[in-house]
């Protein structure tokens, strides 16, 4: 029995990893080849009214540029409305919005700090647009990115349209370049899922939903961008990813900042998955349940499964001592993660260290996320992720590449 448990602990992360990052993407890719490509609706004679929603907490440094680029997009000026929800900001965020000098830019201040989901809930009664475009305070929207997002929503049966993140940063100084590889893989997988039928989570940086779906309140500890796709599906709509609707997302400059961000976002994501567990029923939700299990559940189960490589070989020390190489590898990886977390800010990590360091920091973040879930912690409030103020990329075109 000891050996059986040991081998089970060792093989579990292998099986989950191969399925989540190999088998599942391959199945979805093959499945997508059997479906016609998702086609945007033609440009309408009259574009619908949009509310661009930004929930911000102490974003005085970056918010003005984000609003500037949002208002400069290729879209009729009289059809744009920007609503900034301040989560009881204590810096100059509120004054910046009040003094912006454009009647299309409005401020809704939360009297007490409750977090981004609470701000999104509060915005429901204040939106003016037929569609609500949610963006982060730190991202920039290229000029030609908004119309493709709207054209996707004009396709009958589509309730949510998600943009395509382009991860950008200071190539010479940052310590987290490996993040861009993961983001690229994630966006490609969403493109396959769109062709099959529906994505299971939107990009929190840039997505749009029908006003009636956005107005539905959600528990304040959930991740709305993840939950929004399931809300759309449960109301008979599909959620799609739009390749031409790009947004420029500055990478977190250090793996230390990435650890904080990932543990928080994954913790909220796990709580959201528990809340949405009914969506995993294949008899009711069909392909959506399959993709939810493959894209989200399998990935997030992988993190606690990695603990098996610390314990399993110890149970097999007599019958299969060679498996201790896995324990040694995990310990070495955790030491590497510790090294990357103490790397001086502003100095670029060597390529030999950056990618494995990112992987092991992500594993630690996953463990912390599960710990948050098991302890019943509800991660509603947040601190702005320390991203670069300036992006070394042009926002004039969506053709930028990570």
Where are these regions (language model features)?
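Cell-envelope/extracellular polymer assembly enzymes that use nucleotide-activated donors
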Residues: 48-51, 81, 227
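N-terminal membrane-anchoring/stem segments of glycan-assembly enzymes
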Residues: 1-44
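Glycine-rich, basic loop-to-helix element that forms the pyrophosphate-binding segment
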Residues: 110-127, 147, 184, 227
